[in-house]
Amino acid sequence: LVFDPSCAGVYDRVLLGKLNRLCDDCYNVFREPNVATECRSNCFYNLAFVQCLEYLLPPSLHEEYQANVQMV
């Protein structure tokens, strides 16, 4: 897991791994070269991450993932 200097919050390998996995899954679904990179940009605080979240996970988990982004 590569540390992203744009992440100014808590360095938590478990949280970062969870957020990274969502971006990887999103790339695996769409197979667009920039999806994973865009999803991780600005420490996951971006539209691509939100779109991946909405596409891949049930609404009941959206708030939890958004809270995780705020923590890292």
Curated annotation (Swiss-Prot):
The modification Valine amide is found at residue 72. One of its GO terms (molecular function) is neuropeptide hormone activity. Its main location: secreted. Keywords: Amidation, Carbohydrate metabolism, Disulfide bond, Glucose metabolism, Hormone, Neuropeptide, Secreted. InterPro entries: Crust_neurhormone_CS, Crust_neurohorm, Crust_neurohorm_sf, Hyperglycemic, Hyperglycemic1. It is found in: Secreted. One of its GO terms (cellular component) is extracellular region. GO terms for biological process: circadian rhythm; glucose metabolic process; neuropeptide signaling pathway. Produced by the medulla terminalis X-organ in the eyestalks and transported to the sinus gland where they are stored and released. PROSITE patterns: CHH_MIH_GIH. Disulfide bonds join 7-43, 23-39, 26-52. Hormone found in the sinus gland of isopods and decapods which controls the blood sugar level. Has a secretagogue action over the amylase released from the midgut gland. May act as a stress hormone and may be involved in the control of molting and reproduction. Belongs to the arthropod CHH/MIH/GIH/VIH hormone family. This is Crustacean hyperglycemic hormone 6.
